[in-house]
A protein has these predicted regions:
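Short, low-order "capping/linker" segments at domain edges
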Residues: 106-123, 198-209
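Short cationic amphipathic helices and targeting signals
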Residues: 66-73, 116-122, 159-164
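Short, intrinsically disordered, mixed-charge
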Residues: 28-40, 83-91, 178-185
Length: 209
């Protein structure tokens, strides 16, 4: 059991420069940078503990921003984090523009996700998806069909379904869709297996958190 009183959480906002390291490689590079730093980061089985979040479009400066939560086992001043990580991240095309210590229990950057991706298998349907994909949420019945942002055939009678979380207008339903590993749609025999949380970059492409 993790004692939250001994863990300190910092949210860093990075600005992406031209020629920057691709976002899908950023997590590994961040862990490598932390390993070579003097910072008291929190360990996990896979290395320094961090969570990479979705990007954000900065329209005034036309540059992508990226959030990351990093966990430390000791309270540390924000400027020391920037001092240790700043130049190394800049070499990879990212500049730190904001560092803030936040409460340990504050929602992770994962909560910045706008979409959730499901794989549907098997498809007990003929032809297109029905107009109603009903899901029971407590005392409510939600039609997921209304919130589908994208569909993609994967072969082997499987499809990929992307659902827009913010369109649901219910924090409870959003949280459930983000956390439940599997959903079963009423009356269709369709089972949805959660694959990933997604965000959409400035080009409109979906990227995994």
């Amino acid at each position: 059991m993790i004692d939250s009183r001994q863990i300190f959480k910092y949210r860093i906002k990075l600005i992406k420069q031209a020629g920057a390291l691709p976002i899908h490689e950023l997590r590994v590079k961040l862990q490598e940078i932390l390993l070579n730093s003097k910072l008291p980061f929190e360990w996990t089985k896979s290395g320094p503990r961090l969570v990479l979040g979705p990007g954000e479009k900065q329209t005034d400066i036309q540059s992508d921003c990226q959030y990351v939560d990093i966990y430390f086992n000791r309270d540390i001043r924000e400027h020391l984090i920037e001092q240790e990580l700043g130049s190394l991240l800049q070499a990879e095309g990212y500049e730190i523009i904001e560092t803030e210590q936040i409460p340990y229990n504050l929602c992770s950057v994962e909560s910045l996700a706008k979409y959730v991706c499901y794989e549907a298998s098997p498809i007990a349907l003929k032809g297109d998806l029905p107009k109603e994909l009903l899901m029971q949420v407590n005392d409510k019945v939600v039609n997921l069909r209304s919130f589908i942002k994208g569909l993609k055939a994967l072969g082997d009678n499987k499809i990929e379904i992307i659902i827009e979380l913010s369109a649901l207008r219910s924090i409870g339903i959003e949280q459930m869709l983000m956390k439940l590993p599997c959903l079963e749609v009423k009356s269709t025999g369709l089972k949805l297996k959660r694959k990933a949380l997604l965000w959409q970059d400035s080009t409109g492409a979906f990227r995994q958190i």
